[in-house]
């Protein structure tokens, strides 16, 4: 069967609706972000700490942020984080001992997780199941 771009979009939408994307996100967020330490916190916990620390630094630099509209402040902070590809999150965090051990690189972490062969096989399997379900629905409606 030949597939087109519209079929790809439908498959992607179905994959998301079945909750596979959310499961994948939870899987990545719940993994320890620093496997070199015992009892390493989850990636989500580390990310939350980094965001909180970065926002605190930003407010210290520009106290006017706390007096602005909440939505505007959120948008300003988000744009500051996004514009440099989240590099601000990798800067030294309060409590780091300066030894460089706790370098936090969001992009490197996510890419490494997405290149994990086990995870890729799981995604391929889920996509195949979703495709089979999609084809069954398409054949049943014709």
Swiss-Prot record:
Q: Which biological process terms from the Gene Ontology are attached to this UniProt entry? A: chromatin remodeling; subtelomeric heterochromatin formation
The entry's keywords: Nucleus
| Spans traversing the lipid bilayer | none
Q: Entry's InterPro entries? A: BOD1/SHG1_dom
- A cellular component annotation (GO) from this entry: Set1C/COMPASS complex
**Nucleus as a keyword?**
yes
Classify the source by domain of life.
Eukaryota
Any further remark recorded for this protein:
Present with 1520 molecules/cell in log phase SD medium.
The task this protein performs is described as:
The COMPASS (Set1C) complex specifically mono-, di- and trimethylates histone H3 to form H3K4me1/2/3, which subsequently plays a role in telomere length maintenance and transcription elongation regulation.
Question: Belongs to which family?
Answer: Belongs to the SHG1 family.
Subunit field text: Component of the Set1C/COMPASS complex which consists of SET1(2), BRE2(2), SPP1(2), SDC1(1), SHG1(1), SWD1(1), SWD2(1), and SWD3(1).
Stated name of the protein = COMPASS component SHG1
Which species does the entry assign this protein to? Answer: Saccharomyces cerevisiae (strain ATCC 204508 / S288c) (Baker's yeast)
- Gene that this sequence comes from: SHG1
